[in-house]
Amino acid sequence: MSSNLPAAFANNFLGQSSTWYKTTILAFLVINPVVYAIDPFIAGWVLILEFIFTLAMALKCYPLQPGGLLAIEAVILGMTSPESVFHETEANFEVILLLIFMVAGIYFMKDLLLYVFTKILLGIRSKIVLSLLFSLVAAVLSAFLDALTVTAVLIAVAVGFYAVYHQFASGGGLSSNQYDHTDDSKVDSSNREDLEGFRSFLRSLIMHGAVGTALGGVCTLVGEPQNLLIAQQADWNFVEFFLQVAPVSMPTLIGGLVTCIAVEKLGIFGYGAQLPDKVRTILMDFDKQETSKRTNRDIAALVVQALAGVVLMVSLALHLAEVGLIGLLVIILLTSFNGITEEHRIGHAFEEALPFTALLVVFFAVVAVIHDQHLFEPITHMLLHMDESVQGPMFFIANGLLSMISDNVFVATVYITEVKNALVAGDISREHFDLLAVAINTGTNLPSVATPNGQAAFLFLLTSALAPLIRLSYGRMVLMALPYTIVLSVIGYIAVYQLAAG
């Protein structure tokens, strides 16, 4: 027994992950103290690359454990402190509240969402029109709500669609209650090709929607967390923010929608998959079955969900309270008026978001390392000492590149603070400050679609229950985002350059 104990420890470490992956993480943990002893600055950048690696391998092992071990070691080594981690977490408390309560609130609206989107999916046969609709609706919603909430809606809808067909493909019919849609072992061989086609179809729709959240999120004061931060420093109201950013956000919105049409038309970068006929038939049968067995109580529940949806949108658009608190309001309204009062039924709503919330706090620990080790400082100083005529476009590029690897809220905070200090000191004019604020806002919002760690909504999608179901890996997300990354970055750069040129 004693001889097998070390093997048991080794097997338990990171669970079912591959041996090579476990070895790699252990190697990281051994190497980091050595690199830190040589040069803390280099060690900080090594930690960022290691954390990105854990995100890239999210389908092999959830990043919370390996990323968490790396973050704990960073604190122990002194690369950052518990106080700094807490400060970064506290600064993003609104995002944490949003994840805990808003995602759970969306869970209790899934019946209505599935009903509405089933009608849309079955009513529109053109994949290009459907893709454009997903992207445009996500953009409009994100301009007035927030990207994480919209992404949570997209995830809930896609999981609902997937579960319906997967259950049928596994021989479970359309009415079996005891069913696990994560298990492919029972899928009939005759249905596997259609299942793969359906996965590809859902992947493309979800990615169009996810990029749509970035297209709309950049436009308004409430679209992304960093937008509000920038608006506060620039003293812009809702309308002024929209008008200041519009010379960049509107061309990129058009470019994004054209890209959506182009990739679907050409069938490149993983796009172009059509909804298999058999899947369409099953979804139509499901819709008919649900309609036929819908009772007055079910209809009442849908009405309550619709009314709660109106309350949600109005509250968010008018910013009546923090997003997370509005999510809690939705939970209370839906569970109260739809009779969901058992603790175990309520608890399921929180299963999706809490692991990601924990991962996000680990991410904030990495951000704390970036802050305490001043990893971005050389780039910041270089930009502020450039000629004013090129500062705008260069700020756009720098913010875009850094937001691809770090938290875009953190990047925006660093740069808008430095620029505001320069304005207060009289080093730059108010007009130039406005230009740089636009460059920072668009730089952190647009090119950051390149990687899942660039935007919280993308990271949430990558680590959600949906990603493994539709085989949406880190690499595949990067590939599918690539045409959007290129188009948004180029158009955004040109627009900022034109704005700077006057």
Curated annotation (Swiss-Prot):
User: Any transmembrane segments, and where?
Assistant: 27-49, 66-86, 95-115, 128-148, 149-169, 241-261, 299-318, 350-370, 394-414, 450-470, 477-497
User: Is Cell inner membrane set as a keyword in this record?
Assistant: yes
GO MF: sodium:proton antiporter activity
Q: Which GO terms describe its cellular component?
A: plasma membrane
* Location in or out of the cell: Cell inner membrane
Sorted UniProt keywords: Antiport, Cell inner membrane, Cell membrane, Ion transport, Membrane, Sodium, Sodium transport, Transmembrane, Transmembrane helix, Transport
Q: Which reaction does it catalyse?
A: 2 Na(+)(in) + 3 H(+)(out) = 2 Na(+)(out) + 3 H(+)(in)
> What's the superkingdom here?
Bacteria
Membrane topology summary: Multi-pass membrane protein
The record's section on InterPro entries has: Na+/H+_antiporter_NhaB (IPR004671)
Q: What does this protein do?
A: Na(+)/H(+) antiporter that extrudes sodium in exchange for external protons.
Concerning its family, UniProt says: Belongs to the NhaB Na(+)/H(+) (TC 2.A.34) antiporter family.
- What HAMAP family would the database entry show? NhaB
This chain's protein is named: Na(+)/H(+) antiporter NhaB
